[in-house]
């Protein structure tokens, strides 16, 4: 993996070019990974994603917690001449990264053992050792993969739990570093330690002590428990820790921060020097019946961050979900129609909502890269912060009380309503 910095600004972060595989496409950073569940973009077929969301190659974010059951099949697939993980899930032409935990769902706490990491899958809790993890990585053959780490920490974690997460991660990574040569994939060094600067420094020091070429980048873990918790993080606590960590890292490696961070938090993290994020925020919004409507284009109109499609007030609103959006949903359909799909249990509902949210979020990142290049990210941050209003906009996502379960949501909107 090769990472080259095009420009660095004190006010706007950094702009870079990331090439994951020799001969593969180059990706501009700040980069947005495409979050998947079970190897698929939630609610979207490969054809819909590639024709209605993005026609360009993307980096798919796979998670072991949602794909562990595919290990045996992938072993046979790759040993029989299979063309890799993306081809296996029906998304050829895209590169991929393998993470441990699903950033879209809350990860249960506990279950930690000295030599074992708990992995919460669709079959329940699995015990994952460093040896077993490397066997799985060898079977999956991802383009990039996260080092095994204990990320069971958040803002409320006790000092003892934080220290254990660092010590256990070092033990796991000692084995990973020794055996990484058996896997033809780029390793990402995990940086853990919760909100403790000393613990984070210890984690960084352990990674930087490794021989040159041991890993291709850094991935930050342990700030939250995934799911909606990432949308409510206190940035006054988060940003100083990130700043502390970034100062200790070399410039020529990408920095990845998975999780459903809000648009405003992402902009502030980019100013700190983070390079790669994911689309789990767009998924969480879709799951909770919200269309993203925040503006990132300068105008004089006050905007709101979401459109709640369960709101009875839009049942006769024949405007598009977002007037200046060029996605299929906004070009062909109305707010009233989305509300109708929600009320009538139509599977088309979550499909159209996810198409819009992904399209809008990817457009947002295009604007971010443009702003970083022009060193105007502070102005974009101010717009996203207030949306031309007088107070800061709340981008946090609360679980919709009308949602019963994710399983019913996948069958349509109304099936999930009370």
Curated annotation (Swiss-Prot):
Protein name: Queuine tRNA-ribosyltransferase accessory subunit 2
Functional description taken from the UniProt entry: Non-catalytic subunit of the queuine tRNA-ribosyltransferase (TGT) that catalyzes the base-exchange of a guanine (G) residue with queuine (Q) at position 34 (anticodon wobble position) in tRNAs with GU(N) anticodons (tRNA-Asp, -Asn, -His and -Tyr), resulting in the hypermodified nucleoside queuosine (7-(((4,5-cis-dihydroxy-2-cyclopenten-1-yl)amino)methyl)-7-deazaguanosine).
Keyword Protein biosynthesis: no
GO molecular-function terms, A-Z: metal ion binding; tRNA-guanosine(34) queuine transglycosylase activity
Gene Ontology cellular component annotations, sorted alphabetically: cytoplasm
Keywords: Cytoplasm, Metal-binding, tRNA processing, Zinc
This protein's record includes keyword tRNA processing: yes
Complex formation: Heterodimer of a catalytic subunit and an accessory subunit.
Record's subcellular location: Cytoplasm
One GO process term, biological-process aspect: tRNA-guanine transglycosylation
Domain of life: Eukaryota
Residue numbers binding Zn(2+): 325, 327, 330, 356
Binding note for cofactor: Binds 1 zinc ion per subunit.
Main location: cytoplasm
Alphabetized InterPro entries for the sequence: QTRTD1, Queuine_tRNA-ribosyltrfase, TGT-like_sf, tRNA_ribo_trans-like
Essential cofactor(s): Zn(2+)
UniProt similarity note: Belongs to the queuine tRNA-ribosyltransferase family. QTRT2 subfamily.
């Amino acid at each position: 993996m090769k990472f080259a910095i095009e420009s660095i600004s004190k006010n706007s972060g950094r702009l870079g070019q990331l090439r994951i595989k020799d001969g593969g496409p180059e990706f501009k950073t700040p980069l947005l990974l495409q979050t998947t569940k079970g190897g698929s973009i939630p609610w979207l077929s490969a054809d819909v994603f590639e024709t209605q969301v993005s026609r360009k190659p993307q980096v798919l974010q796979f998670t072991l917690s949602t794909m562990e059951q595919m290990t045996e099949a992938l072993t046979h697939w790759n040993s029989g001449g299979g063309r890799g993980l993306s081809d296996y899930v029906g998304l050829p032409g895209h590169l991929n990264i393998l993470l441990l935990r699903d950033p879209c769902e809350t990860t249960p706490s506990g279950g930690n053992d000295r030599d074992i990491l708990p992995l919460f899958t669709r079959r329940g809790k699995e015990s994952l050792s460093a040896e077993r993890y490397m066997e799985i990585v060898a079977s999956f053959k991802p383009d990039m993969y996260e080092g095994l780490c204990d990320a069971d920490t958040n803002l409320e974690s006790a000092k003892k739990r934080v220290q254990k997460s660092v010590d256990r991660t070092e033990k796991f990574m000692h084995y990973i570093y020794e055996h990484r040569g058996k896997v033809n994939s780029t390793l990402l060094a995990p940086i853990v330690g919760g909100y403790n600067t000393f613990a984070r420094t210890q984690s960084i020091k352990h990674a930087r002590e490794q021989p040159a070429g041991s890993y291709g980048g850094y991935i930050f873990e342990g700030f939250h428990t995934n799911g909606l918790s990432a949308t409510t993080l206190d940035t006054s606590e988060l940003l100083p820790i990130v700043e502390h960590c970034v100062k200790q890292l070399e410039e020529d490696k990408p920095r990845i921060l998975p999780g459903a961070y809000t648009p405003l938090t992402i902009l502030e993290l980019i100013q700190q020097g983070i390079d790669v994020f994911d689309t789990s925020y767009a998924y969480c919004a879709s799951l909770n019946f919200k269309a993203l409507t925040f503006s990132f284009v300068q105008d004089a109109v006050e905007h709101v961050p979401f459109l709640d499609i369960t709101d009875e007030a839009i049942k006769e609103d024949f405007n598009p979900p977002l007037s200046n959006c060029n996605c299929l949903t906004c070009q062909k359909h109305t707010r009233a129609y989305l509300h109708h799909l929600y009320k009538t249990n139509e599977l088309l509902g979550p499909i159209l909502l996810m198409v819009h949210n992904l399209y809008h979020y990817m457009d947002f990142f295009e604007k971010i890269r443009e702003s970083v290049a022009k060193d105007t990210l502070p102005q974009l941050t101010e717009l996203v912060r207030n949306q031309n209003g007088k107070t800061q906009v709340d981008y946090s996502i609360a679980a919709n009380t009308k949602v019963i379960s994710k399983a019913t949501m996948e069958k349509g909107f109304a099936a999930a309503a009370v």
